[in-house]
Amino acid sequence: MNSARNILRTERLMLREATSADIDAAHAIASDFEVVRNTGTWPWPPDRDFTASRCQPIPADKGLGGIVARGSQIVGMASVFGEGELGYMLARAHWGKGYATEICRALIDLTFADGRWDRLKACVFTDNPGSAHVLLKLGFSEGSACTGNCASRGQELPTRTFTLDAPGLERA
């Protein structure tokens, strides 16, 4: 039995801490190049040790997030980490169902309520319009273009940047 702590629930999904019991399911997701090509840090070919490093609870001072599940089925991962960067990946079978928007909206609400970050950011490779669309639906504003490293593709790629301020925050 998985004793991971639940972080949040939505109508259809749950976000809970990742544990070593999640390695096989997370590695199956990371074994689809079409998924990891849209991430900055996940390697290709898939590396089980890297997956295992991501399948452990995130220390509270480092971020918030973990495994996205629908019932007992793991559908992906989502987190806010570092300097308030939102990251997520879903198994391809679960693209186009609104899961990314649903879990990220709840994670954003929890993150701002938590008070550790007053601004979130996200970076999306320009050839990943689906994630850019999710961020815009979530209220993110698009910033300047830049480049970002893509471990799975082994190169720097053109990147779109997005930011979202906490409700009520006024910036000078």
Which positions does each model-derived feature cover?
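Acyl-donor (CoA/ACP) binding surface of acyl/acetyltransferases
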Residues: 1-38, 65-172
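An amphipathic alpha-helix signature
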Residues: 20-27, 48, 52, 56
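Conserved GNAT-fold acetyl-CoA-binding loop/helix
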Residues: 34-55
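A generic alpha-helix propensity feature with a strong bias for hydrophobic helices
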Residues: 46-49, 60, 161, 170
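Short loop/turn motifs at secondary-structure junctions and domain boundaries
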Residues: 56-62
